[in-house]
Every structure is written in C-alpha cells, then in structure tokens.
C-alpha cells in the first residue's frame, strides 16, 4: 500500500539547527583601503606606542619587575670631634660628643651644638625683668600689674617697678634670677664643629624578596672608617661625612647656620635592581637645607645649699639633622611583564579604532568606506512557488516507488496455502497533476 501523498510536502525546518549557532566561529572582515593619509597616521601612532612601551615603560621604568616599596631600615649615627670655648661665664671648657650632641646615643634625628648663651647660677627669687621683653619697661608701679605674666616673660610680675640698670627701669618678677640676657654671641663659639665627622650606618631590608644590605663596607680593618670619607665614585660604602661639606651640599653656609642654628635634611635612597644581584643595590645621598634658625634651652640643676635649688641655663644654637630613608627594590616577574605588554597591545587597539573613526566619519570618501566595510545579509524568504515545487517533487518520488512495487511478479502459493496480497487499489495516474497555486501561502 503506497504512502499517502498528503505527507509529501513536509520540509526540514530552519529551527532544526537552533542552538548550534553558539558553536559557530565568527571572524572579522578586513577591507584594504588605499588611503595613504590614514595609513601613515596609523603607522606613526603604532611606532610611537611601540617605542613608548618597549623603550620607556618596559626598559627605562623596568615595567617587567615586581616592586617592593616599603623597606624596613635601621639607622645608627655617630659624631666625632672636640672643641674648646673660652667665655667669662664658664671659663675654659672642653666640649666633646657627650656635650654637643643631643641625644648622645645616635638616632635618625639629632642636634649638633654650634653656639650657646649661658646664664649661670640661677636661683628662684625676685629680680628685674630684662628690658628686651615686651611690656617689661615701666615708670611707676601701676605699670606692673601684680600676677601678670606675658608670653615672652621670664616670670610673674610682683607689682613693683624697679631699676634694671642706669638707663632702664623694668617690672620686678618672680623668676629664676638673674634672668637670661638674650644677647647672642657675635660669632659661633663652637666654630670647630665644621671639621667634625658624621658616621651614618643604615641597614635596609626588603622583606618581599628576603634581601638585606648595609651602606657600610663589611671590612675587618678597624681603622678603615677613621680615615675614609664619602665619595660617590671612589668610596661609596664609606658613609663618613665632614659637617662643613655636608652643610655646603645642602646649599647652606656653615658660619651662618652655626651662629643662629638651622635644620638640614639627609635623605638616603635605595634603588635596587635585584636582577643584577647585590651589586645592583646601593644608596644615594641627598641633602636639603630645611631651616635657617634653630635653638632650644636646657639646664643643669643642683642644690646650692639646703632648700635652695640652683641651675645653669643654656640656650643652645646648632644644626638639627633629620635622616630619612626611602627605597624600592625590583625583580623580574611574569605578571608585571604581561601587564605592561598587555597595556601596549590595548593602546595599539585604540589606534586602530581611532583610525577607523577618521576613515568612516572624517575622510572625504567616508560614505564609500562605510558601504564597503559594513554589509547587510538577509535570509531568503519562503514563497508559494517554492513550496509547491517541493510538494511536486515529493509526489513524483512517491508515485515512482508505488509503480515499482505494483510491477513486481505475482505471488506464489506457499506451503501453508497463503499468498501475498496485492495492492488494494491502483497507483495514481502518472499524468495526474497537482493544482497550481499562485501567490503566497
């Protein structure tokens, strides 16, 4: 029995392959344009990016290295030298490290005494205020309110106006007497301090790379640091500096700083390239003048007699040294190298995008390049004629199969007496035509 013709028109649905589009590989379409202006600009920008990435970011700035920007450090300082002063208040006095260095144990901040003003044997009592103090001069007692004390006063007013000397009358105060004169010596008393030497020992550690190094030469010679002086080329691992040279490198004059004091900053910077080993890590020293005036007061107390405390007041002028240690260490790493190269590749992509914008929107032939670069592909639509053509081909195939079966030899009786059945009706005529249909389904 032949299959019915009603099923002859079934067709494969386009949706039968739905889902396989996710596995398709899509590639870009490249259009070669003969526009020398945009082409030259693209090559110029690409060349600049390659030079920047390779020459500057990768090699000059060592973009292929991992960085440790937080070093751990320790500092030990020592000052060496002696000086002698001859003044009326103290007589002949020798000054050594314990006298002119504050604090004497050596830290990253210390003070070198270069000048001083001494007021010996002060005891608490009543005495005239110094005329240089604001509101200290007076004519009558009413000019000195009792209990009043000013910001710059040496004590508290007693309410009396007394004679200071032959030319001045000042308010009497309760204070450490006699009061400080306030007259600074005309020349530094410790002028020999410019020949003192400063030893700075610094050890830096980069824990990220488990690396540690000192700025002082490792030597068994105990006299090496007694004779050497720092020179960047000849003795970079001898951190011994002459004070006068150090102040000059900071941009100051020792005589000026020694008179009224000042502040000098010393920076020790480590820039270590650990790819070259220990030889690629050494310190750089720089000096900066921070202040041109610095002083403070200190006193030595004792008991002059039972119940009477006395002191010697020193107003110290000198140079304060602030030592700052900074540093960084670098070593080759795959991640920073990949990041640097990836950044360069991204910039090359930006150049291509920029040139596309010029070509498609700015160039005189932009409309032509637009039509060439972008194409619209539309899927063909199914029409009535194509559907009926499919049905006709399927019907003819089924008719041929039916005729082949009907022309087969007659069946013979079998042993059981049964025989093969013939088709129940004749095949359709070969000249039977499907009705034509125009228009869309």
UniProtKB/Swiss-Prot annotation:
Entry-linked Pfam families: P2X_receptor
Domain topic, free-text comment: An uncharged region within the N terminus of the P2RX6 subunit inhibits its assembly and exit from the endoplasmic reticulum. The P2RX6 subunit lacks nine residues in the left flipper, a flexible loop structure, which is a key element in the activation of P2RXs.
Residues covered by region (Disordered): 410-441
PANTHER family per record: P2X PURINOCEPTOR (PTHR10125), P2X PURINOCEPTOR 6 (PTHR10125:SF21)
Disulphide bond pairs: 127-177, 138-161, 144-171, 228-238, 272-281
Low complexity: bias regions: 410-424
Gene: P2RX6
UniProt-listed NCBIfam families: P2X (TIGR00863)
Post-translation changes: N-glycosylated. N-linked glycosylation can affect trafficking to the membrane and function.
GO molecular function, one term: transmembrane signaling receptor activity
Lineage: Eukaryota, Metazoa, Chordata, Craniata, Vertebrata
Primary location: membrane
Species name: Homo sapiens
Catalysed reaction equations from the record: Ca(2+)(in) = Ca(2+)(out)
InterPro entries tied to this protein: P2X6_purnocptor (IPR003049), P2X_extracellular_dom_sf (IPR027309), P2X_purnocptor (IPR001429), P2X_RECEPTOR_CS (IPR053792)
GO cellular component: cell junction; cytoplasm; dendritic spine; endoplasmic reticulum membrane; glutamatergic synapse; neuronal cell body; nuclear inner membrane; parallel fiber to Purkinje cell synapse
UniProt GO BP: calcium ion transmembrane transport; muscle contraction; response to ATP; signal transduction
Phosphotyrosine modification, residue list: 64
Subcellular locations according to the entry: Cell membrane; Endoplasmic reticulum; Nucleus; Nucleus inner membrane
UniProt keyword annotations, A-Z: Cell membrane, Disulfide bond, Endoplasmic reticulum, Glycoprotein, Ion channel, Ion transport, Ligand-gated ion channel, Membrane, Nucleus, Phosphoprotein, Receptor, Transmembrane, Transmembrane helix, Transport
Protein name according to UniProt: P2X purinoceptor 6
Residue intervals on the Cytoplasmic side: 11-39, 355-441
Ranges annotated as spanning the membrane: 40-60, 334-354
Family: Belongs to the P2X receptor family.
Composition bias, Polar residues: 429-441
